[in-house]
C-alpha cells in the first residue's frame, strides 16, 4: 500500500514472489488484497500462480531461465487456468539472487547466455500470443549493465530490460550504507556462488560474513 501511495498512479507496482518460500501463496494473496498491479514469480516454477492470484485485474509474469521453462509454465497456465502471462522475465546466469541454473554449470561458466535464451523464449511465447490474442512482452535481466546492453537486447526482440543491483547503491534505496559500500567497492573476484537459505545457488559479493 505504501508503494502504491508513493507511485500515485504513475506506474505499476509489482511484487517478486519466490516459489521456494513457505509463505508464497499467502504473500501473493496479501499483495493482491492490497492492490498490487502485478506479480512476478520465480525461484522455482510458478505453475499455480494464476490460481493463487485469482483475478485477471492483476498482471502475472514468470521468471524463466530457458525456453523450456517458459513453455512448461505457459502450457500449464493455458490448460489449467485458461490464462497466459502478461509478460515474461528472463533471468540470466549473471543475475543476483536465486538462479535457475545448475551450480556446476554456474561455477564452470557453462550456462546459456541471455543471447542464447532470448530467442528460445521469444519462439516459445508466440503460440500463446496467437492463442490468447495479445502480445507477451519479454524482458531480460541479469548482467545488463549499460545502454549498449539495453540496445543490444531490444534489437534482438526484447521488450525491455530489468536492472536491480545497480540501483541498490542509489540514494533512493533504503539499504544500509555499509551494504552499499560493499557493492561499490567489489570487484569481479569478490563474486561467489553460495547456497541461499532456500537451497538454491546464487551469486553474492563475498565478505567475512558470507
Regions inferred by a protein language model and the residue ranges of each:
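Active-site entrance/lid segments in N-terminal catalytic domains of soluble metabolic enzymes
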Residues: 1-131
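C-terminal helical cap(s) of enzyme catalytic domains, especially alpha/beta-barrels
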Residues: 102, 107, 170-187
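Catalytic cores of alpha/beta
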Residues: 68-81, 134, 144-159
